[in-house]
Amino acid sequence: MKKTERPIITFPNGQTVCPLGQGTWKMGQSAARRHEEIRALQHGIELGMNLVDTAEMYDNEELVGEAGRDCREKVLLVSKVLPSNASYRGTKLACERSLLKLGTEYIDLYLLHWKGRHPYEETVRAMTELQQEGKIRLWGVSNMDTADMERIVSLSGGSGCATDQVLYNL
């Protein structure tokens, strides 16, 4: 059997990822399904779906961390800060909480989940510092429109925004 080449996405830092990721929204809500959900994530990773997406609001980062614990170097781990926590201090604290729950020293891609009340300047400053501290490898946003993206990349440090994750569920 001939091995088929899979498409990949390459981020600005050279990190590559399968364009089809595993979302985890609604996982972790049933203790009875915990083992099954962990195994499903692990199976996806084994098949090459190395992007695993979670968020602080999903309340399942511990489950996601457990699923990827034995293959962390193979996984591109995505998590998101809630807009209500996206002040400078709030972003840094939310990231620390996520790191603890995920059981990892770094998050590969940390996103602002959607537009909120905090100024983008604060969020961008926090994301830039988290990246410099090695707590996140890349940062970006989720669910932003063109005007928001133009605003973000115009800010000091805004050119570090690696992606806008657009909502698309199958």
Question: Each PLM stretch: what is its role?
Answer:
Residues 23-35, 79-89, 112-113, 118:
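Active-site mouth loops of central-metabolism enzymes
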Residues 91-111, 129-133, 154-155:
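CE4/NodB-like, metal-dependent polysaccharide N-deacetylase domain
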Residues 8, 115-170:
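Beta/alpha (TIM)-barrel catalytic core signal, keyed to glycine-rich beta->alpha loops juxtaposed to Asp/Glu
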